[in-house]
């Protein structure tokens, strides 16, 4: 979690994106396998990279919380967005989807042209 916060701060500040970071404090009390930690970090990193490369956003909200028996990661921006119906996923999004599948998680991408993008990962906890 600390690495994710540091990466977010560095990435957002370097690219002059205003951001809000909402991470639950209870992450110290949950157990996630090392492999799933790695997947989670790399999904987060790829989502930030995509935001910087394609979104042209000014603001972002990055949150990670525990709800019931699920870890929910959400990355939301106010960028240019895209039409998800006519979008052909590149390697980055395909890799994120593959990692989510390996975690037995669900990755949702919601985007509207001119209104930004929200990426949400729902990961079941043991």
Regions found by a protein language model. Give the residues of each.
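Coiled-coil dimerization/phosphotransfer module
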Residues: 1-126
